A protein has these predicted regions:
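Predominantly soluble domains enriched in secretory-pathway, periplasmic, or organellar proteins
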Residues: 1-143
Length: 143
């Protein structure tokens, strides 16, 4: 299991059988928050409150990249099939889409302020964002 640790900033790797800490991987950006893993590549994507996503190699502990984002993130979701990482920012109310090959933000999807919770349906390639101010859900389809 992986767990974000706020201070010192990093990712703890836990042994699933007894939840003991196997390793701690420090990162250079404060406030690790959202986290997703690409099991095939062994990379973790750590969205941090300081306005960046850290790409971390889990086998070496090395930071492969730091991708700037527009604000404080909440949830991230990896779409490994399309090489995209979705990162929700409740303020200003967007989902930033990071190209995980080029390691840049290549799209910004408007939601609404406060919308920081979403889920991704890998089979249907749809992203569902929950919009708390308007009491709705938005559906975005990958093409």
């Amino acid at each position: 299991f992986l767990v974000n640790i706020r201070e010192p900033a990093g990712v703890a790797i836990l042994e699933p059988k007894n939840m003991s800490q196997k390793a701690f991987l420090p990162i250079s950006i404060v406030g690790p928050h959202g986290l997703d893993i690409n099991d095939e590549s062994g990379l973790a994507y750590v969205a941090c409150d300081a306005g960046a996503v850290v790409v971390l190699d889990l086998s070496t502990g090395h930071e492969e990249a730091v991708v700037p984002i527009e604000g404080v993130p909440d949830v991230v979701w990896l779409n490994a099939k399309r090489h995209r990482l979705y990162c929700a920012l409740g303020k200003p109310g967007i989902i930033e889409v990071i190209d995980t090959l080029k390691l840049v933000v290549d799209e910004k999807v408007n939601t609404e302020e406060g919308a920081h919770t979403f889920t991704f349906d890998r089979k249907r390639q749809r992203l569902y964002a929950f919009l708390p101010k308007s009491c709705r859900a938005a559906v975005y389809k990958e093409t």
